[in-house]
Curated annotation (Swiss-Prot):
Residues 379-568 form the Helicase C-terminal domain. Keywords: ATP-binding, Helicase, Hydrolase, Mitochondrion, Nucleotide-binding, RNA-binding, Transit peptide. This is ATP-dependent RNA helicase MRH4, mitochondrial. A motif (Q motif) lies at residues 143-150. One of its GO terms (molecular function) is mitochondrial ribosomal large subunit rRNA binding. Residues 36-49 have a biased composition (Polar residues). It comes from Candida glabrata (strain ATCC 2001 / BCRC 20586 / JCM 3761 / NBRC 0622 / NRRL Y-65 / CBS 138) (Yeast). Belongs to the DEAD box helicase family. MRH4 subfamily. The gene is MRH4. It catalyses: ATP + H2O = ADP + phosphate + H(+). A motif (DEAD box) lies at residues 296-299.
Length: 568
């Protein structure tokens, strides 16, 4: 007997998420007193048949039992394999396991497609995208190839790019993997194809005060970075890119709108503020004509503190054809929110999601041992000296980012590093005015500066001196006490002390060193902080300062990296 049970999963927004059929198989046992009850008792043949049936039934049960055991063993092996590939880091706020039915297909796609010429992009768009990537890269001599997430995203989005219906895609890939261009390339292609494939529509809108697409991000710094990325080379496509943030006055905004805005980069709250600008009549109609929307750092934009503004902004843009969610992490809470809001979203992920970048050299510094004796600030200062004198990046100034868990401690650390240890250091928190923040981070997001000839010689002399090991770690520095060369000189090292405000999405060009002054308490924080270095196949170092209170899951990070495990 076979019974079929149909199960429907229903979510609070009224969407049917999935329909499954679960088949339950029931094995009927043969009852005494059935058809065989008319057979004579004591018959030898009947006894033989009964014995045969009994043996067959016994074998059947044994075979069924064996199958169940095999399935159980397979399940146990799968769970064991999964546990070998995943590592539970942190106290709470875990990350979703990287599992979806497209992973294997995506991996094959990346292996098959290695050139931008193999992706469906208009020739002029392809050329422009390659030039944008080249301009944004530190190594301008190497040949430009699409990164795995760029291959996956461009390939999938181009499939039905111009269909006039809502399509939702969720891009998720490791930090520093080229996600910005993974969504910008299809966006640029979409805008140019509208001009070519629908000339009548294009003629009717090309001189109108409209916004054709929007990229929403959570911070001022990200608005500025994406705007710079898209405008860093001369415009060869005729695409008007504008930003709407605290650094743009209303008059400039109005001028931008009059000349047609093809791509507007802003935050959800600033986008909604268009409805309150008196000089803009019917802002609601402008928002309704937006057809392509990107939520970059979507896990932030859809968390509790941002969700209301983000939801209002999406609701105002009611005629969207493409919605792209982009993030370097998929926290469990974000995954639940995304499933409720966008049950039909197509995941576009890479196998390395939630893994630390391959190019990271992760080092532990124990502040509990001598000579620090429990002083984390001493361990931090000594580590900065080690970075300054280690002989890496010869001829260029070095940069280092120090991450702290709470903004109230930023100023204290900055003052001690500057006044007691003589480091060139600045601090940055969300309490600062927007323009001040942009000025402070500019040296860290720009390519590294070359040293002067005098600085190069001092740098070389210092790097030639003897080295001594730092206690409680696997790093060494120049033996400053025994050196007579430039004893009061610290090689050019810029240090930025900040919180998670700058751990999201920012491309710190040439930053090879990150120090985790406080141990990140969640896997999300660790992935984003460590991901400020070793971006786009570059190398980098992360130093984590620990003490007696540090949990074993934090101390295990170097092993996690070595074993290529994903964080959960």
């Amino acid at each position: 007997m076979v019974s079929i049970l149909a199960i429907r999963t229903f979510n609070p927004l009224g969407h049917f998420v999935s329909t499954q059929c679960v088949r339950a198989y029931a094995i009927n046992s043969v009852r005494a007193g059935s058809k065989s009850s008319s057979v004579r008792a004591g018959s030898k043949n009947d006894t033989t048949r009964a014995s045969s049936k009994k043996n067959k039934a016994g074998k059947s049960k044994l075979q069924l039992s064996a199958r169940f055991k095999q399935n159980a063993n397979k399940s146990q092996k799968a769970d064991k394999f999964k546990s070998q590939k995943q590592f539970k880091y942190g106290l709470y706020g875990g990350l979703k396991e990287n599992e979806n039915k497209f992973l294997e297909t995506n991996a094959n796609l990346v292996e098959k497609i290695t050139e931008f010429e193999e992706l469906k992009l208009l020739p002029e768009v392809r050329k422009h995208v390659i030039n944008l990537i080249k301009k944004d890269s530190l190594n301008t001599t190497e040949e430009i190839h699409p990164s795995p997430i760029q291959t996956i995203a461009i390939k999938r989005l181009s499939k039905n790019l111009m269909e006039p219906k809502l399509q939702v895609h969720a891009i998720a890939a490791e930090t520093g993997s080229g996600k910005t261009m993974a969504y910008c390339a299809p966006l640029l292609d979409y805008l140019k194809r509208q001009e070519i494939e629908t000339p009548e529509k294009w003629e009717s809108i090309k001189d109108k005060a409209i916004i054709r697409s929007v990229i929403l991000v959570p911070t001022l710094e990200l608005v500025d970075q994406i705007y710079t990325t898209l405008t860093c080379i001369p415009d060869t496509l005729g695409i008007h890119v504008h930003k709407w943030t605290t650094g743009v006055d209303y008059q400039q905004l109005l001028e931008n709108l009059k000349s047609r805005t093809d791509i507007l980069i802003t935050t959800p709250s600033k986008l909604l503020s268009l409805q309150r600008v008196r000089m803009i009549s019917r802002a609601d109609l402008i928002l309704k004509r937006i057809e392509f929307v990107v939520l970059d750092e979507a896990d932030t934009l859809l968390d509790k503190s941002w969700l209301e503004d983000t939801h209002k902004a999406l609701k105002a843009m009611s005629d969207v054809n493409h919605l792209v969610l982009c993030s370097a992490t998929i926290p469990n809470e974000f995954d639940r929110t995304m499933t409720k809001m966008f049950p039909n979203a197509i995941p576009l992920t890479t196998p390395r999601l939630h893994k630390l970048p391959k190019g990271i050299n992760f080092r532990i510094i124990n502040a509990a041992v001598s000579p620090y004796k429990g002083s984390k600030i001493k361990a931090l200062a000594q580590t900065l000296y080690a970075i300054a004198y280690d002989g890496t990046d010869p001829g260029f100034e070095k940069r280092c980012i120090v991450f702290i868990n709470e903004k109230k401690n930023v100023d204290n650390v900055v003052q001690k590093l500057r006044n007691e240890y003589g480091h060139d250091v600045v601090g940055l928190t969300g309490d600062m005015e927007g323009r001040t923040r942009l000025e402070l981070i500019r040296p860290f997001i720009s390519p590294p500066e070359k040293l002067t000839e005098q600085e190069k010689q001092i740098d070389k002399d210092l790097n030639d001196q003897e080295t001594v090991n730092i206690s409680g770690s696997n790093i060494s520095i120049g033996n400053i006490e025994n050196s007579n060369k430039a004893s009061n000189f610290i090689p050019k090292l810029r240090v930025l002390v900040t919180t998670d405000l700058l751990a999201r999405g920012l491309n710190f060009k040439g930053v090879r060193n990150v120090i985790l002054y406080d141990v990140p308490i969640t896997a999300i924080d660790l992935v984003h902080r460590a991901g400020r270095t070793a971006r786009m196949r570059q190398s980098g170092r992360v130093f984590m300062i620990i003490d007696k209170k540090t949990q074993s899951w934090a101390k295990a990070v170097p092993t996690i990296l070595k074993k290529n495990k994903a964080l959960t």
